[in-house]
């Protein structure tokens, strides 16, 4: 017996997990024995006895039917229309047992009937079943079915599956049965996993040619999502010449001619066309190549004078995750600027053995060769480069005895550099990137030899500079890239902390810098690019120890902004610092 002097414990609730199951099992037993059944459901030629309370508690449809003042609420026999008796039997069994038998032969009828009866749990289970059955041969059918019944969860899943497996999907018969609007929706997606844009063009043409008589009128509309600036002109021309239908061939030739006229349009019009960045940039999930160009290399523990300028170029495949070598630069150089324009990689300026260069080289991935193009007006190393409005901009840098503060612009059509303005703050070995038609410069080293925190934006059209909030940390030899409407400042160096592993992100929405996850390795003079929604950081140099020169790095890290984590991937073939990286 409890001690009467002890305080009584408060009552505590206890629950039984089996209670609901036992009650449901007993109710089902009563249904099978036709005990207490108060309604008969007539489905086609078959009738099912059940309990109004159980039906109303399981389904808003039945709750409205029996309690909403409808005539069925007082009838002993209630007809259920639009459902086959065998399917209704399965759903009624689920109401009384919580178990549903789903198979490939009944899943579509089940999900339609369950949706009508507002049995959301059965709809969910059917969707999960279809997700488990999806493959490249049936995903289009599942996509169309989910669109037809407005099942948004299954629609999103099947659509994502089509994007990921596009190369397998578009070769199947179901792909050719897409409606025009469904096809266009798929072809517009940034998420198509493709090797190149030409595969999307072929898929569109394949759909048109399947029923040319009826689909001829949709040619322009269906081909509109194709990013023609990314298609090799000769390959496209060869395809068009091979089209047997005369009218279709003429239509394609007209489209190609219009595209070529846009590419050769006057500078003012070209500025407008290049604002349509979705047409000139590869899709987010397209196969891309990272080109690591030039830089210098030095062994760990070597002397400062042991650094060697590089001419070698490596290419990283985002699909295979391997590095391979490609044609080398004509001129070995470090501290250069690297960018991409018109499907070509440009290597600009730089230095070797204290000789600063003004020369520019251009790499054609089709011919796999570097060629020399026009030189800048001023030699520069530690400069910033980016592409804006169809031209290359080269900013600042070290020009010999001082820091250059001029801005040059390269027009590929005229093969000419011209000075177009000046920097607000002279700097070299700074970060530079373009975003939505504006050029951003961050950090670097000033005229006084001090590492900077400052952040500025340049408008190439108005030629005006505007200050933005400074970074939290002074950084020179940093890497910068734009990703998801933010700008990232990665690593770098300052005299107090040496090589940095910290990373800051500028949010335009919040108008401030915030720190994100740090890299695994401190790096200065590394390269940073945004690819497929991720940041790739390659090479650079580590911190110096015991007055020894820091060694160059061959490691590569990838930052995922969604998980705020860094992952190491395959190393470069050659360690390098103060090189450049371009994405094609």
UniProtKB/Swiss-Prot annotation:
Pfam families in the cross-refs: BACK (PF07707), BTB (PF00651), Kelch_1 (PF01344), Kelch_KLHDC2_KLHL20_DRC7 (PF24681)
PROSITE patterns: BTB
Domain of life: Eukaryota
Keyword Repeat: yes
Principal location class: cytoplasm
Any one Gene Ontology BP term: proteasome-mediated ubiquitin-dependent protein catabolic process
GO molecular function, one term: actin binding
Kelch repeat ranges per the UniProt record: 289-343, 344-390, 391-437, 439-485, 487-533, 535-583
Name of this chain's protein: Actin-binding protein IPP
Organism: Homo sapiens (Human)
């Amino acid at each position: 017996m409890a001690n009467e002097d002890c305080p009584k414990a408060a009552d505590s609730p206890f629950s039984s997990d089996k209670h609901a199951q036992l009650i449901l099992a007993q109710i089902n037993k009563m249904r099978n024995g036709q005990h207490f059944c108060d309604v008969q459901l007539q489905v086609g030629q078959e009738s099912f006895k059940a309990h109004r309370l159980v039906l109303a508690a399981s389904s808003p449809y039945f709750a409205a039917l029996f309690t909403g003042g409808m005539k069925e609420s007082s009838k002993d026999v209630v007809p259920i229309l639009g459902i086959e008796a065998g399917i209704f039997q399965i759903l009624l069994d689920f109401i009384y047992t919580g178990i549903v038998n789903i198979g490939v032969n009944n899943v579509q009828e089940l999900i339609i009937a369950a949706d009508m009866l507002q049995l959301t749990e059965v709809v969910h289970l059917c969707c999960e079943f279809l997700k488990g059955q999806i493959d490249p041969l049936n995903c289009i059918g599942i996509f169309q079915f989910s669109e037809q019944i407005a099942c948004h969860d299954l629609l999103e899943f099947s659509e994502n599956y089509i994007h990921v497996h596009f190369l397998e999907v578009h070769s199947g018969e179901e792909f050719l049965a897409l409606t025009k609007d469904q096809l266009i929706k798929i072809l517009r997606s940034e998420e198509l996993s493709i090797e190149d844009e030409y595969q999307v063009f072929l898929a569109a043409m394949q759909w048109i040619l399947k029923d040319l008589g009826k689909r001829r009128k949709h040619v322009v509309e269906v081909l509109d999502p194709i990013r023609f600036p990314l298609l090799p002109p000769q390959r496209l021309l060869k395809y068009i010449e091979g089209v047997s239908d005369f009218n279709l061939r003429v239509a394609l030739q007209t489209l190609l001619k219009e595209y070529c006229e846009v590419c050769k349009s006057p500078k003012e019009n070209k500025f407008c066309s290049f604002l349509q960045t979705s047409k000139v940039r590869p899709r987010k999930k397209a196969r891309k190549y990272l080109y690591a160009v030039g830089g210098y290399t030095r062994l760990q523990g070597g002397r400062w004078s042991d650094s060697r300028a590089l001419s070698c170029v490596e290419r990283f495949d985002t699909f295979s995750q391997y590095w391979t070598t490609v044609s080398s630069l004509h001129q070995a150089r470090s501290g250069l600027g690297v960018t991409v324009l018109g499907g070509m990689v440009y290597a600009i300026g730089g230095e070797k053995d204290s000789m600063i260069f003004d020369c520019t080289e251009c790499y054609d991935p089709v011919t796999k060769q570097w060629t020399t193009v026009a030189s800048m007006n001023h030699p520069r190393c530690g400069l910033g480069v980016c592409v804006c409005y169809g031209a290359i901009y080269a900013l600042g840098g070290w020009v010999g005895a001082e820091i250059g503060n001029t801005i040059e612009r390269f027009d590929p059509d005229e093969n000419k550099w011209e000075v177009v303005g000046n920097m607000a703050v002279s700097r070299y070995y700074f970060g530079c990137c373009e975003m939505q038609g504006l050029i951003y410069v961050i950090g670097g080293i000033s005229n006084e030899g001090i590492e900077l925190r400052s952040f500025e934006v340049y408008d190439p059209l108005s030629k005006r500079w505007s200050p933005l909030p400074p970074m939290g940390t002074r950084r020179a030899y940093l890497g910068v890239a734009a990703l998801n409407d933010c700008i990232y400042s990665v690593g770098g160096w300052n005299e107090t902390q040496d090589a940095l592993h910290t990373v800051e992100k500028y949010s335009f929405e919040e108008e401030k810098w915030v720190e994100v996850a740090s890299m695994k390795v401190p790096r200065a003079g590394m390269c940073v690019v945004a690819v497929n929604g991720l940041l790739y950081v390659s090479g650079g140099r580590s911190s110096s120890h015991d007055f020894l020169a820091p060694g160059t790095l061959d490691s590569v890290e990838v930052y995922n902004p969604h998980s705020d984590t860094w992952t190491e991937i395959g190393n470069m073939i050659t360690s390098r610092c103060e090189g450049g990286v371009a994405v094609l």
